[in-house]
Amino acid sequence: MKKKNKKVNAGILIIGNEILSGRTQDKNIAFIANWLNSNCGISVNEVRVIPDMEKIIITNILDLSKKFNYLFTTGGIGPTHDDITAQSISKAFKVKYEYHNEAFKILENYYGKDKFNEGRKKMAKMPKGSKLIYNPSSAAPGFITKNVFSLPGVPSILISMIENCKRFLVKGSTTHSTTLNLYTVESTISKQMGSIQKKYDKVVDIGSYPFFR
């Protein structure tokens, strides 16, 4: 973890047709946001979900990477034809899309030369100059290009990798939270909550989250 900074923010970009179609339910947004906040003092200020379409990926990469200190992407870095995140980021930043020597060796050792096919080799290709995010689960690394952290879409693999992002991040101020369980009707306390929020707006963020018993 790098030197602490007062306010550090991030965006999350979820890439995948399967999320937009409803076939797959995203589990990465909540995990990444919670991990960044509790471990790094980094606030997630925006989340977008987009399809596997090069032009849309490029547009969002450029927009969000300029807007926030960090951008975390998930999905699209696997071995199949529709995994186009790495080449899209290369085009966004106008750098070569090429084999990363260390990533190539990691994957070749993991699969063995006889089973290291073109699809698996593809997972070693990324934007030139990228730093690796090591993968203790299935070998294929994620990568960091400028301030963009690219991780896989499979939640269990992403979870196993995310600690390896920490040393590349500048830590922000830690946010502390407290939960009060009030067994009352929300509308009866809305005025008081609004008054407290207005009075302490610079240091406190109050939310009301109803539940049914």
Residue locations for each model-derived region?
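N-terminal small/polar loop signature for handling phosphorylated ligands or for N-terminal nucleophile
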Residues: A30-K91
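Generic secondary-structure signature for well-ordered alpha-helical cores
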Residues: N37-S43, V49, K66, Y70, ...
